[in-house]
């Protein structure tokens, strides 16, 4: 690629190969002090191979990056990103799902209000419980995104083993999804992966990937949760044994397609990956959507903490968002049948 061609892009553009910067256009050179031809590419940009799109932090600011693999290397097109509240399509989807759930509550309680039944049990209990968990999940998502848009979202900072967090999530989700014929496998590194962050938030971000993948395998199959490290970055991905999502489907997961669709009744409100992206941003990481055909859909990436004695700034613990209920059941409530959720209900 000639420099003249690179300068024709209206946004900052960087061409790199083998983790080294080959060229930057004039806009990128003016914007980034640390990126120049011959220098090292920031680790977050090569934490995931292939073509992808996502929001990352570069020199202290958030940018929307689209990476495209070309013959001469990978081209990165960079756009400044503004903090925003729920997107219009996401808000429509959330309100649509809330109306559906309120209708479910009315239908499930109507026979008792009319005196036709006097004991709340059996299938009615199962459906009511499932609707309750789904409503709780929806409210959790909207609450977190609202706080993030207002700049009021904070994370506890504690030392965590990301390998352990992933292993526990795979075990807990596997025990639940096993009843649907879905097996969850975990593949991680040989040792611990130390990170600094909020364990509950990171767990919930991971559960969004598992939940989305489980929806694709409702008739059974295998989900594979993998954790790997490259340099000072950790990378998490969840895949299944079915066909990989198309590029259009993957962009639709984050509501960034040309015509984002409001999810159907059993597809959630479409907020899950936005929540995961918000959590990763809060931890200095990113949610990256692989745009290549046949590639896994979504990655979570974040920096590891290898330095001992690192100084941490501690925050006051935030509110417990799951009302003390099983977070794995909440995350999978759009996927699991009612009888499986009922077992966790305590009167």
Predicted regions and their residues:
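Sensory modules in modular signal-transduction proteins
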Residues: 1-28, 94-96, 103, 147, ...
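Conserved glycine-rich
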Residues: 284-285
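A conserved beta-strand-to-alpha-helix junction within the catalytic ATP-binding
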Residues: 156-171
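Conserved micro-motifs of the catalytic ATP-binding
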Residues: 150-155, 194-197
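Short beta-strand/loop element within the Bergerat-fold HATPase_c
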Residues: 222-232
């Amino acid at each position: 690629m000639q420099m003249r061609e690179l300068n024709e892009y209206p946004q900052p553009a960087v061409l790199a190969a083998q983790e080294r910067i080959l060229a930057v256009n004039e806009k990128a050179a003016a914007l980034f002090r640390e990126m120049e031809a011959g220098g090292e590419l920031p680790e977050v940009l090569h934490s995931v191979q292939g073509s992808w799109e996502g929001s990352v932090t570069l020199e202290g600011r958030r940018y929307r990056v689209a990476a495209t693999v070309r013959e001469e290397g990978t081209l990165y097109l960079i756009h400044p990103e503004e903090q925003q509240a729920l997107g219009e399509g996401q808000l429509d989807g959330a309100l649509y799902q809330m109306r559906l759930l309120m209708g479910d509550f009315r239908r499930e309680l109507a026979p008792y209000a009319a005196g036709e039944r006097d004991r709340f049990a059996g299938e009615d209990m199962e459906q009511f419980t499932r609707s309750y968990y789904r409503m709780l999940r929806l409210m959790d998502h909207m609450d977190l995104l609202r706080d993030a848009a207002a700049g009021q979202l904070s994370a506890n900072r504690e030392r965590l083993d990301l390998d352990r967090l992933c292993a526990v999530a795979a075990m807990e989700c596997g025990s639940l999804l096993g009843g649907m014929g879905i097996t969850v496998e975990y593949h991680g590194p040989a040792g611990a992966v130390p990170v600094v962050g909020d364990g509950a938030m990171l767990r919930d971000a991971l559960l969004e990937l598992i939940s989305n993948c489980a929806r694709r395998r409702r008739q059974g199959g295998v989900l594979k949760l993998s954790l790997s490290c490259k340099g000072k970055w950790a990378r998490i991905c969840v895949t299944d044994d079915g066909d990989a999502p198309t590029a259009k489907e993957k962009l639709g997961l984050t509501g960034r397609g040309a015509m984002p669709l409001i999810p159907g009744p059993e597809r959630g409100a479409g907020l899950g990956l936005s929540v995961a992206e918000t959590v990763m941003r809060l931890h200095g990481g990113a949610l990256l959507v692989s745009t290549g055909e046949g590639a896994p859909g979504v990655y979570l990436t974040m920096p590891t903490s290898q330095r001992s004695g690192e100084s941490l700034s501690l925050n006051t613990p935030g509110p417990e968002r799951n009302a003390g209920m099983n977070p794995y059941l909440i995350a999978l409530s759009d996927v699991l049948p009612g009888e499986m959720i009922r077992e966790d209900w305590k009167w």
